């Protein structure tokens, strides 16, 4: 069974009296081009760590009660890492074996979703849902904001995406 996507998760944050910024709203390195702190379009997913942890444990309890033995979760980096940190507790409390796609392969360019809006994620989308990739939306001469990883304009392709998927499925 595949549960609906969770649109809330943990991430780094910055609060001051005038604004709240989360995740890639904050430049902290690792992106192709540095950029100022700003609220990015679509940045609406943040949940405090403890609330996220409580939610994941409740999901684990419900799935265990329904007879599930294995729970696989993967998504946005911080939520994936926090889910992984709960693997032992989920096993002890609910008898659930938990893992993420990061558990399957070591850190490699072919690891599933190992960047942020860059060549890896773009290539996966090109392979699975090519109609969603709109490379023409990159403004001519402007560098992308909030991208971490290899530049998809140069390195992304449907073939690369299929290779990522095949390697991870086989692993």
Regions found by a protein language model. Give the residues of each.
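Extended, histidine- and acidic-residue-enriched regions that form the cofactor-binding/catalytic faces
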Residues: 1-171
């Amino acid at each position: 069974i595949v549960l609906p996507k969770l649109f809330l998760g943990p991430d780094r944050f910055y609060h001051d009296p005038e604004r709240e910024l989360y995740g890639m709203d904050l430049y902290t390195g690792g992106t192709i081009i540095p950029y100022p702190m700003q609220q990015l379009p679509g940045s609406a997913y943040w949940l405090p760590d403890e609330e996220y942890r409580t939610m994941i444990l409740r999901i684990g309890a419900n799935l265990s009660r329904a007879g599930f033995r294995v729970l696989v979760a993967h998504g946005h980096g911080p939520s994936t890492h926090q889910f992984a940190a709960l693997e032992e507790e989920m096993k002890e409390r609910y008898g659930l074996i938990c893992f993420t796609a990061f558990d399957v392969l070591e850190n490699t360019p072919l690891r599933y979703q190992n960047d942020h809006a860059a060549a890896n994620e773009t290539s996966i989308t090109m392979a699975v849902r090519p109609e969603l990739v709109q490379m023409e939306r990159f403004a001519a001469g402007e560098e992308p904001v909030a991208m971490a990883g290899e530049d998809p304009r140069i390195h992304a392709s449907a073939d690369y995406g299929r290779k990522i998927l095949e390697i991870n499925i086989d692993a």
